Amino acid sequence: MAFDDAALERALRAETKHGLTLYCNGETLTALGYEWMAVVPMDGLRERLRGTLGALVEMLGYIPENDTVRIVRNKGGYLVQPELPETVGEEICGYAGEPHTEEIRPTGLRMGMNFLMQKRNGEIVGVVPRGANLDVRRYAITAGGIVRQEDGDTGERLYRRGYRPREDTDSEATLRKWRHLEVMSWCDWDAPEE
């Protein structure tokens, strides 16, 4: 199982405070959190009866099969509300629907709560770390700023919204720091990916 089971379990539990959406079609489980989405094969989850699957059973009371639900933590436990698959599908398409991607790699740097990643052209993107498994080998970023991680062997995919400062909303100091980072090359693009 290539995905980080403990990290995904923590992300699911943390996300229920604001609301976590689950979409399961029997083969894959798609979890939609705030600014991230993970797609995990159900076969990989069923190999273990604790971790992520244990958290889902605790929240739902059963193993998800063909469900679309929203889970919110309340005082006594978890509130589970059915959702329309069409509504969730629109949100999933917002993450996964963009076909054009560019290669992007982690720099090893952080700014605040964001991990910084760099495109080949030098552009830096901050990525929300929640639920992330930074050991996945291949990364790409869509034109809309969605960072994709993928492991072709297991089908794990994690999508997260990228962040870039904007001249109309961010301070000049933030923009200056960002420009300074983009002048340098933080990734060895000639080295093979591990």
Regions found by a protein language model. Give the residues of each.
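Intrinsically disordered, low-complexity linker/loop segments enriched in Gly/Pro
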Residues: 1-40
